[in-house]
């Protein structure tokens, strides 16, 4: 298990919101910044950090409305706002060069950031995200159904655990434990409620206008950062065909399919995910990043 002395919590302000982040490892190690998915949280990356922390600094942000970060009263849960938050984090930590990794929504945000500030990035890691996945895939329709059908509270922790297990039948028991611990909390009434802004996030996802959606193809075609695409071999979100089109469109994208994983690759097959990411990180050639900061 990870040495808990290497784990630190921090806070950063963005758009008047107080946002929480977690940092694992030495401050002077090469930085890897990680962005979670739609209804996730910073600590989802803890097993990944455990696999990297001997050589890298891993920083994970509770994106606005999730984890311990403030909810946005304006419900601005869209890419432009998330990228402002990421920029605030990067500047607060004075990260001159870093690798950016994102899952699903976090992957879309990572693509947007890479297009805006490529000079800061040594590499880009994308977990199961690509063009059209959020709008036209079977997985996107599944997620919309989940958002509509998710209860606002549970009578007990057992009920909450059973709900998450039905929603994520493939994730490991340790990943399920993490979801219970970090996505839920006990209210004063004794009911179990969500830590994240479930209603606001659902409204933003279900009612997004075309202008609020991220169109990834232009970003991918103009991407000039070494990129690792980690796709779930059983994903209903990012199809094998779209992943193939991404690598064909940009020679800088390296693709690895993780067998036995759905859209939630790092939760379903953590050992394979961590091994693939670590191998790729160890190969990146950027002396400025290697010296830390």
Residue ranges and their predicted role:
Residues 81-98:
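Conserved acidic catalytic loop of the alpha/beta-hydrolase fold
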Residues 100-102, 127:
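Short beta-strand immediately N-terminal to the catalytic nucleophile in serine-hydrolase-like folds
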Residues 17-71, 285:
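Conserved HGGG/HGGXW glycine-rich cap/lid loop of the alpha/beta-hydrolase fold
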Residues 102, 106, 110:
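Gly/Ala-rich beta-loop-alpha elbow adjacent to hydrolase catalytic centers
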Residues 111-115, 122-157:
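Flexible "cap/lid" loop of the alpha/beta hydrolase fold
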Residues 261-270, 274:
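Catalytic histidine-centered segment of alpha/beta-hydrolase-like enzymes
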Residues 186-248, 254-257:
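Conserved serine/cysteine hydrolase catalytic core
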Residues 152-211:
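Conserved alpha/beta-hydrolase catalytic His-Asp/Glu region
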């Amino acid at each position: 298990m990870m040495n808990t002395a290497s784990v630190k919590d921090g806070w950063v302000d963005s758009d008047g919101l107080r946002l929480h982040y977690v940092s694992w490892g030495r401050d002077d190690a090469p930085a890897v910044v990680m962005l979670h998915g739609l209804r996730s949280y910073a600590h989802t990356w803890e097993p990944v950090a455990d696999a990297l922390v001997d050589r890298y600094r891993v920083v994970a942000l509770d994106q606005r409305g999730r984890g311990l970060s403030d909810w946005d009263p304006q419900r601005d849960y869209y890419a432009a706002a998330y990228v402002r938050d990421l920029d605030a984090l990067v500047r607060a930590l004075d990260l001159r060069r870093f690798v950016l990794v994102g899952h699903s929504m976090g992957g879309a945000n990572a693509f947007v950031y890479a297009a805006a500030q490529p000079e800061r990035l040594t590499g880009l890691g994308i977990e199961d995200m690509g063009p059209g996945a959020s709008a036209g895939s079977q997985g996107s329709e599944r997620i919309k159904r989940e958002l509509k059908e998710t209860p606002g509270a549970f009578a007990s922790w057992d009920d909450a655990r059973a709900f998450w297990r039905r929603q994520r039948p493939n994730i490991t028991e340790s990943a399920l434990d993490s979801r219970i611990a970090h996505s839920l909390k006990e209210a004063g009434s004794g009911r179990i409620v969500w830590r994240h802004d479930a209603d606001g996030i659902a409204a933003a996802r279900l009612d997004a206008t075309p202008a609020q959606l991220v169109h990834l193809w232009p970003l991918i075609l103009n991407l000039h950062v070494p990129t690792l695409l980690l796709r779930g071999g059983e994903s209903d979100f990012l199809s094998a065909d779209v992943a193939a089109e991404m690598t064909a469109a940009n020679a800088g994208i390296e693709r690895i399919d993780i067998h036995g994983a759905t859209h939630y690759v790092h939760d379903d097959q953590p050992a394979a995910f961590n091994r693939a990411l670590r191998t790729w990180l160890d190969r990146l050639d950027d002396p400025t990043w290697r010296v830390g900061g």
